[in-house]
């Protein structure tokens, strides 16, 4: 192939690439704009939430809008009743008193049409908190949940141990910033967490 033929093939390839980009770029920008502007058309499904909790692996509270008083907080499923969508967990964390262990129960219910499923977390002392499952990423095995505590809206991002063994959940961090816009973000997990 002489120089003129190489240049001609190069020009054709570049023209094809430019035309492809011209058609794809508006679509890509629209998807990006929806995410950055907090597109609210996505509604978490009951199947996504139940799949997230069906794991036998530890689930870490990776980031929260509440303060960083508890570090390395994780939950591990101890039992489940699929007929009632009830999951029992052992919770461990580190705080200024040591490494407490406590227990909690998650109850899921079908949400109304176009609404996320209901989720109630009951602590061992009987205190209940209603959570809203907001977003899930099946690739990063993470979920973002919102709730109200002391009259203030809060957010938490939970990530499967299988994910954070190998990677940092970048997509989930981005979604946390969108779903929990304007809230503080404290990372509670680090690779030095003991369990």
Language-model regions, residue ranges each:
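A beta-rich soluble binding module of mature secreted/lumenal proteins
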Residues: 2-195
